[in-house]
Amino acid sequence: KKICEIADNLEPRAYTSREFIKEIGKYLKTNSKKKGSLIETAYDKNVPIFCPAFTDSSAGFGLVMHQEKNPKKCITIDSIREFRELTEIKIKSKSSGLLMIGGGVPKNFVQDTVVCAELLGKKVDMHKYAIQITVADTRDGACSSSTLKEASSWGKVDVSKEQMVFAEATSVLPLIASD
């Protein structure tokens, strides 16, 4: 219901998930009883969060409620503009690396910025490194049906600096992130 409330108070137009998540952070900054969430902290530090499969989440239900209430004046999530925005970040970056938790749409989305940049006529380097934390297995079509080694065959990731971490993210990410 809070997602619906946030959306109800925005100008009706297409937003990227990054723009909408920033609005969630703004809302949390003023209204959250529990401070220091990831989204609020990202908002405070002006760190963008991209979620290319935003509608494939419980937050997506809030947007469905919002659109049901406001069929003619509603917001939408524009994943194509978001992909272009992320590709522009890749084009402007001197180098890039990936830390992916899980797989699916977000994994493909960020890896494909290299391919998209090239299709737009821009010369970009592969992602310098890639780490994927996942419990998925390619044998059953999970893991987006490919390991990072396959991504190197498409020119997305430098194969010499890729690492698959087959583990549950909540157990290993704190170890990776700690100092």
List each language-model region with its residue ranges.
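Ligand-binding beta-strand-loop-alpha-helix segment within the catalytic cores
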Residues: K1-A59
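Conserved active-site and cofactor/substrate-binding residues in soluble primary-metabolism enzymes
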Residues: Y15, E19, K33, S37, ...
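Active-site rim loops that border cofactor/substrate pockets in soluble metabolic enzymes
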Residues: P52-G97, P106
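A short acidic (Asp/Glu
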Residues: G60-L63, F109-T113, A142-S144
